[in-house]
Amino acid sequence: ILQQNKIEKLPVVTNENKLVGLITFSDITKLKLKPIANKDKYGRLRVAAAIGVTDDSVERSTALIKSGVDAIVIDTAHGHTERVVGLLKELKKNNEDVDIVVGNIATSEAAKFLLEAGADGIKVGIGPGSICTTRIVAGVGVPQFSAILDVCKSINNKVPVIADGGIKY
């Protein structure tokens, strides 16, 4: 109807005729093309920001959370360490409403370790991607499908799992 009648915006009003929003043709198109986009309760795309495991990680994540990110990703080449879990616990202690995703890992033991520490999501992948140098530099890596299967079986869908690299569609 919008396109046929060359109407750019469709007002959304309450019973009292108070304007509460506008719908555009591109809004409808986005809904049709990307029905499972990760959005917040207001319909906005959720935003995550990655931090490393450094001396200023807590300060950086605090600034990111104050700016409105929905999730923090603790991004490290080897997520199965006490230092990573220490940072995870520190962030969870002060930011209960913010999802904390942690990775990368490649084993069921590491997944359980992060899950027990409070991770809201887990990134899987040690050396699987085409631009990743971990296998060359460190001499270690796990085939991506094997790592994902191992991790998913061990945590039984308790948190989302992200496959980070090594998969072609």
Regions found by a protein language model. Name each.
Residues 1-6, 13-14, 29-32, 56-65:
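The conserved cystathionine-beta-synthase
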Residues 2, 10-12, 17, 28, ...:
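Terminal peptide-recognition signature
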Residues 9-11, 50-52, 70-81, 99-104, ...:
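Catalytic beta/alpha-barrel core
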Residues 40-50, 91-106, 121, 154-165:
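Short beta-strand/loop segments at the ligand-binding rim of alpha/beta enzyme cores
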Residues 46-58, 62-72:
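Active-site beta->alpha loop and helix N-cap motifs at the rims of alpha/beta catalytic domains
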Residues 50, 117, 139-163, 168-169:
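Alpha/beta catalytic cores of nucleotide-metabolism and tRNA/nucleoside-modifying enzymes
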